[in-house]
């Protein structure tokens, strides 16, 4: 029986471990071929297809570090014969990859199933007929006995209609019946009142009169009690007005405080006099522009100076047209 032994690179560094693994998985009568799994996965070594009855993978690492690429699992599947086994230090969490490659996952190994033989299913040949021969129409048999009427939409007899109307009148569904005449019975409201219910004793208060015919005066206490009701209502209104006055008063105080603060801010603001707000006259001594050099000449004047083009002058000196007559000529 041909056996392929795939060794992890760490096994090669320890010859004693390699020999112990061979004794564990391989018997004396088996033909063994060993390769490093990296060389097999990278196609450096040529391995025959469908040749080995068993492939043993030896990996001394822990179980969670024994993973194999899905492509390598497919290669191992191709090395095995039908019903061949892949055993050894198998990865613990790649059963799905093994199934996708074609293996049948079992407890201690992965099995390559034997391919199922194809079964030929004979097809029934149609009888050849002459194309010119006309096709026969299907034949239907007529029933010997007519079936009974099962249509419930047949018209009812007069007795059935009478029975149905009587049932509708006896039940509450008579209100929804379409056979009603559409006339509503009017009820007289006066008949609902019984005359016996009207003969109840009415309590009539006695007149405030004395036996001698004089009217009894109301006592001071009653007058006070009657007045308390009015006083209570007025007190309630007064409380509401007082509450409203308090709210309005607090709002007025807040408005006054804000007005005082605004006045304080306005008092601190910078105010200009009329002399300061008037247009600057550069012909008057002490009045200067932003550059303070309007009287020196164009070389010292700013871009917006109104005296651009005029000769230099002294502050306070009157400028006449005769002085610049030569420049305009």
UniProtKB/Swiss-Prot annotation:
It is found in: Cytoplasm; Mitochondrion intermembrane space. It comes from the Eukaryota. InterPro entries: Anamorsin, CIAPIN1, Dre2_N. Its main location: cytoplasm. It comes from Meyerozyma guilliermondii (strain ATCC 6260 / CBS 566 / DSM 6381 / JCM 1539 / NBRC 10279 / NRRL Y-324) (Yeast). The gene is DRE2. This is Fe-S cluster assembly protein DRE2. Its cofactor is [4Fe-4S] cluster. A motif (Cx2C motif 1) lies at residues 291-294. Belongs to the anamorsin family. One of its GO terms (molecular function) is 2 iron, 2 sulfur cluster binding. Gene3D superfamilies: Fe-S cluster assembly protein Dre2, N-terminal domain. Keywords: 4Fe-4S, Cytoplasm, Iron, Iron-sulfur, Metal-binding, Mitochondrion. One of its GO terms (cellular component) is mitochondrial intermembrane space.
């Amino acid at each position: 029986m041909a056996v392929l032994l795939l060794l992890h690179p760490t096994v090669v560094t320890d010859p004693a471990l390699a020999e112990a693994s061979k004794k564990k998985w391989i018997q004396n009568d088996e033909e063994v071929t060993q390769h490093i799994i990296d060389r097999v996965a990278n196609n450096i070594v040529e391995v025959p297809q469908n040749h080995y009855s068993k492939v043993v993978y030896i990996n001394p690492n822990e179980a969670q570090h024994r993973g194999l690429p899905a492509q390598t699992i497919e290669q191992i599947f191709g090395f095995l014969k039908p019903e061949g086994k892949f055993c050894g230090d198998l990865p613990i969490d790649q059963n799905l990859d093994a199934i996708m490659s074609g293996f049948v996952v079992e407890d201690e190994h992965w099995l390559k199933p034997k391919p199922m033989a194809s079964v030929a299913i004979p097809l029934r040949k149609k009888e050849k007929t002459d194309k010119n021969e006309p096709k026969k129409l299907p034949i239907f048999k007529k029933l010997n006995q007519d079936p009974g009427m099962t249509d419930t939409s047949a018209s009812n007899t007069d007795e059935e209609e009478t029975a149905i109307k009587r049932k509708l009148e006896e039940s509450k569904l008579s209100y929804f019946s379409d056979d009603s005449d559409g006339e509503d019975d009017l009820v007289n409201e006066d008949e609902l009142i019984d005359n016996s219910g009207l003969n109840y004793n009415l309590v009539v208060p006695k007149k405030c009169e004395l036996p001698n015919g004089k009217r009894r005066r109301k006592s001071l206490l009653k007058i006070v009690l009657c007045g308390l009701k009015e006083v209570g209502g007025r007190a309630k209104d007064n409380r509401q007005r007082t509450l409203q006055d308090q709210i309005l008063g607090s709002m007025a105080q807040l408005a006054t405080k804000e007005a005082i603060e605004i006045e304080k801010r306005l008092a601190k603001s910078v105010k200009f006099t009329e002399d300061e707000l008037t247009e600057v006259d550069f012909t008057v001594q002490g009045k200067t522009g932003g550059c303070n050099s309007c009287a020196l000449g164009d070389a010292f004047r700013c871009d917006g100076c109104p005296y651009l083009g005029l000769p230099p002058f002294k502050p306070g000196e009157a400028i006449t047209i005769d002085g610049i007559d030569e420049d305009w000529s």
